[in-house]
């Protein structure tokens, strides 16, 4: 697989097609991308001027933004590739500098259900997390709620995992959870 974290957020359709053609030529079968990106993902519009959420509310998605996500998933599918789809980068789950996180257990469930329903028939592998470890019980609860929402929406028919930081595996937190299809061990972002 390849990582194109900012794919939905930065590129236009022509650039997306070029990128996917290039990855297909190189033999990639999975492209990982995040819907709510880490780098100004809530405040900077995509190439077509759309923000992902209405008033930063995860229970209200912006249709124009998600039409581009739909486009990417369809175009990848035409090339025999699945999308490793991260609903959000983990920075939106972590409280920082006294500021509340975007997600709480309730809106994480609703957001997950919206996405699970929307993409239940698509070639998607769900990847929660985003280069962060689960540090607090509240973070754990938020990820659990999002996973439950996705499974409610898609009927539990798609693979799902969690993307931790480097040299750590998702099994530390979620190995025995019914929604976890496989563990992810990130080999990058650490010194040898």
Go through the PLM ranges and name each one.
Residues 1-191:
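Active-site mouth of glycoside hydrolases
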């Amino acid at each position: 697989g390849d990582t194109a974290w900012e794919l939905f957020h930065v590129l236009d359709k022509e650039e997306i097609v070029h990128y996917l053609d290039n990855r297909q030529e190189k033999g990639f079968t999975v492209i990982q991308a995040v819907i709510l990106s880490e780098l100004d993902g809530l405040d900077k519009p995509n190439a077509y001027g759309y923000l992902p959420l209405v008033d930063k509310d995860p229970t209200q998605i912006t249709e124009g933004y998600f039409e581009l996500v739909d486009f990417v998933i369809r175009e990848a599918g035409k090339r025999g590739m699945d999308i490793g789809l991260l609903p959000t980068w983990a920075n939106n789950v972590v409280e920082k500098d006294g500021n509340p996180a975007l997600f709480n257990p309730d809106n994480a469930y609703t957001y997950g259900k919206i996405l699970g329903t929307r993409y239940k028939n698509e070639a998607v592998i769900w990847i929660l997390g985003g280069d962060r470890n689960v540090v607090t019980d509240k973070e754990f609860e938020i990820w659990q709620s999002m996973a439950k929402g996705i499974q409610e929406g898609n009927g539990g028919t798609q693979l799902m995992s969690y993307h931790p930081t480097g040299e750590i595996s998702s099994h530390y937190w979620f190995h025995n959870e019914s929604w976890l299809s496989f563990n992810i061990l990130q080999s990058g972002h650490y010194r040898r």
